Amino acid sequence: MHPEAKEPDCGFSEVLPRELGSLFSDTYTEESHYAFCGTELRITQHYGANLGVAAPVWDAALFLCGYFEEQKLDFKGKKVIELGAGTGIVGILVSLLGGHVTLTDLPHALSQIQKNVSANVSSNNPPQVCALSWGLDQEKFPQDYDFVLGADIVYLHDTYPLLIQTLQYLCGPQTSIFLSSKMRQEHGTMHFFQDILPQYFASELVKRNKDEEINIYKVTRYQN
């Protein structure tokens, strides 16, 4: 445990090297509009910017946003971190709902996230945008989050131990984790949720889109 860890200083200029800006030259961008919880989100996706899976708005992210709307979850004043934020749509929505949000991803995705934050969130309560590599630098972050969020971040088997390690560090007894995932058999996603995750956390399937094969799990620490 590292109780001394505080919210990292994630000034955008500090976590994103200048040279990464060149990744976004001559790229194809697409702006999409989404409506959740009475607010409209304008999300730009930078295709062809070497972003890979971080570029698009995935269906699992939209499904999670819809779940928050349906359940009327109260994020006001809550401390929230999103892992593998990609476009940032989930964390941006939570920020607009009053959460104190930190959006994280690998360094190459941060410019896209920051642009979407700037397009949607006023200066009153902007999310922090930070680099976080699972299993490597999670100890730069605090351990008192109310919510940890992830949308379509369970798809590479080699990263599963790193994700578990990161969740174990970030989550305290009071933390609720929401993971929304496309259940891709070829990527072992079901294996993660049925066999790996229960070794470390209690999990509950709270929402399922049968047609799209997307599940939302609420995950918490086991209570002694």
From Swiss-Prot:
Keyword Methyltransferase: yes
Location(s) in or outside the cell: Cytoplasm; Cytoplasm, Cytoskeleton, Microtubule organizing center, Centrosome
One GO-annotated biological process of the protein: peptidyl-lysine methylation
Binding site for S-adenosyl-L-methionine: W58, G84, A85, G86, D105, W134, A151
CDD domains cross-referenced by the UniProt entry: AdoMet_MTases
Function, in words: Protein-lysine methyltransferase that selectively mono-, di- and trimethylates 'Lys-165' of the translation elongation factors EEF1A1 and EEF1A2 in an aminoacyl-tRNA and GTP-dependent manner. EEF1A1 methylation by EEF1AKMT3 is dynamic as well as inducible by stress conditions, such as ER-stress, and plays a regulatory role on mRNA translation.
Protein name: EEF1A lysine methyltransferase 3
UniProt organism field: Xenopus tropicalis (Western clawed frog)
